[in-house]
From Swiss-Prot:
GO terms for biological process: fatty acid biosynthetic process. The keyword Isomerase does not apply. The lineage of its organism: Bacteria, Pseudomonadati, Pseudomonadota, Gammaproteobacteria, Enterobacterales. GO terms for cellular component: cytosol. Gene3D superfamilies: Malonyl-CoA ACP transacylase, ACP-binding (3.30.70.250), Malonyl-Coenzyme A Acyl Carrier Protein, domain 2 (3.40.366.10). Pathway: Lipid metabolism; fatty acid biosynthesis. The gene is fabD. Keywords: Acyltransferase, Fatty acid biosynthesis, Fatty acid metabolism, Lipid biosynthesis, Lipid metabolism, Transferase. Its EC number is 2.3.1.39. One of its GO terms (molecular function) is [acyl-carrier-protein] S-malonyltransferase activity. The active site is at S93, H202. It catalyses: holo-[ACP] + malonyl-CoA = malonyl-[ACP] + CoA. This is Malonyl CoA-acyl carrier protein transacylase. Pfam families: Acyl_transf_1.
């Protein structure tokens, strides 16, 4: 039996017509999770992904909840189809909430309320500011940190995510991010992509939001995860209720070190399964580790392929 880890994304490229393949959308377990989640959220999230005439899913307020619920629904179906347990679970950014739900550390209802509250606090932190997040392709972390220091942008612009050796996400005040983007381009960046994520996360602008969130987290019930969970920002195991609270609070202004965490665990883990409707983390992993197997459970073919390998 192979060791495997489950990966949970924090963001997905939401396309409402293709959020869930028929393999999932027609499944009773998946439908049940969406019904339960809709009760906690206060509106029909299943209907939203089927018909979104006002294009609400372009707003993080809605898309983050869809990402969470979709991943949990796919996980519940996965759990129903096999009897093995993951050796590890990891969430990228907001995906840590999903990882904690699936490892029975956090109730689904509490996760939904935390994500709604987290978004509210982050929006309040940006009340008089305009933010921006961009992905820099083709420059490494060291080069970008030198540019931030050279042009004195270290306080206005943060490294939000180190996804691979040569894919770095920047986050911060819009004009400052735009200026450092120009310097990155001159330094040899192959591509610079504006990310439609608002408010901007994993940057110093979110420190006030972090303090507010910590207060709420202190009044939220957590349990010790039944599967090992590693934080994608601190790279530490979440082995106590207090550690989880502190990690989730710090997360919104800290760097997601995806590149480091995957390199670290590849010594013991051969198979990486992304529990998602897309393949964002799977594609990142293929750039980080060449010899391990990465599969997204985003369609029937991949789901059945993964089941066959694991069983």
């Amino acid at each position: 039996m192979f060791k495997y880890t489950l990966l949970f994304p924090g963001q997905n490229d939401i396309n409402r017509k293709k959020i869930l393949s028929p393999f999932f959308s027609k499944n009773k377990i998946v439908q049940s999770i969406f019904r339960e989640s809709s009760e906690y959220i206060g509106y029909d999230i299943w209907k939203l992904i089927q018909d979104d005439p006002k294009k609400k899913l372009k707003n993080n307020k809605y898309s983050q909840l869809v990402t969470l619920v979709s991943s949990i629904a796919i996980y519940e179906l996965w759990k129903n189809k096999q009897c093995t347990h993951p050796n590890l679970v990891i969430g990228h950014s907001l995906g840590e909430y999903t990882a904690l739900v699936c490892s029975q550390s956090l109730k689904l209802s509490d996760a939904i309320q935390l994500i709604i509250t987290r978004y509210k606090f982050m929006m309040e932190a940006m009340s008089k500011k305009i933010g921006l997040m961009t992905a820099i392709i083709g420059l490494n972390e060291r080069t970008i940190r030198k540019l931030l220091k050279k042009y004195d942008y270290s306080h206005e612009v943060s490294i939000a995510c180190i996804n691979t050796d040569n894919q770095i996400v920047l986050s911060g005040e819009r004009n400052s991010v735009k200026h450092i983007n120009l310097h990155c381009k001159k330094a040899g960046a192959k591509n610079i992509i504006n990310l439609y994520i608002h408010p901007p996360s994993h940057c110093t602008l979110m420190k006030k939001a972090s303090k507010k969130l910590l207060y709420v987290l202190k009044h939220t019930t957590f349990k010790i995860p039944i599967y090992p969970v590693i934080s994608s920002t601190s790279l530490k195991f979440q082995n106590s209720e207090q550690a989880i609270r502190i990690s989730l609070a710090k997360q919104i202004y800290s760097t997601v070190r995806w590149n480091s965490i995957i390199k670290y665990i590849k010594k013991d883990i051969f198979i990486f399964l992304e529990v998602s409707t897309k393949s964002i983390l799977t594609n990142l992993n293929k750039n980080i580790i060449k010899k391990s197997l990465s599969i997204s459970l985003n369609c029937q073919a991949n789901f059945l392929k993964a089941l066959k390998i694991i069983l």
